[in-house]
């Protein structure tokens, strides 16, 4: 879910930079997923699979239910990031001979990478403890929140307390790892800026 949220949100951010036909409708559809009750979305996905005579599982209906919750946040974050991205940087890269793919790979992605990590954190956090949207469409394989609710209804066990204790530590490790990645990316970017300044600051350079 986290990887798909990052990928689709990034592509949506690129698409919304262009004034394509229907972009306003797409934007309001994204916002509608935030407004609609979680149970109704889960029920709609479940009924859709039932009408198509398909079996809903965690990698089909469950995945769609989770993405309907994580993608709106990811898309809105990427829209804010791309709105602040200076297009003259990409134009300068093209003036230096870069094509569209090289400009995307060496300019756009490095600049927006911290934002994509933030989108990934949002996607992980929202999906990790999602219950209402998953309860009706996960099939026979339950996610952790659904399984914990089911076990709690039949009586608490030591394993349930152990899982409840380890869950915050696992989430904390993911958050710390993300901050470390952002720190090293910013440090690397600062080093590249210093190297460029030294290059162009030398006498006779250029």
State each model region's role.
Residues 7-11, 43, 61, 68-90, ...:
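Membrane-embedded alpha-helices of multi-pass transport/permease systems
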């Amino acid at each position: 879910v986290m990887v798909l949220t990052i990928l689709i949100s990034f592509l949506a951010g690129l698409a919304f930079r262009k004034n394509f036909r229907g972009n306003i409708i797409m934007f309001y559809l994204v916002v509608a997923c935030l407004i609609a009750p979680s149970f109704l979305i889960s029920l709609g996905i479940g009924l859709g699979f039932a009408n198509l005579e398909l079996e809903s599982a965690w990698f089909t209906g469950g995945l769609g239910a989770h993405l309907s919750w994580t993608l709106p946040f990811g898309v809105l974050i990427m829209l804010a990031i791309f709105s602040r991205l200076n297009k003259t940087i990409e134009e300068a890269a093209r003036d230096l001979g870069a094509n569209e793919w090289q400009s995307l790979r060496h300019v756009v992605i490095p600049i927006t990478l911290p934002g994509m990590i933030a989108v990934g954190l949002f996607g992980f956090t929202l999906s990790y403890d999602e219950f209402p949207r998953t309860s009706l469409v996960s099939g026979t394989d339950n996610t952790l929140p659904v399984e914990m609710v089911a076990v709690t209804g039949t009586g608490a066990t030591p394993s349930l307390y152990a899982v409840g204790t380890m869950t915050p530590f696992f989430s904390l490790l993911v958050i710390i790892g993300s901050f470390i990645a952002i720190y090293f990316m910013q440090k690397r970017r600062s080093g590249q800026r210093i190297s460029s300044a030294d290059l162009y600051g030398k006498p006779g350079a250029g």
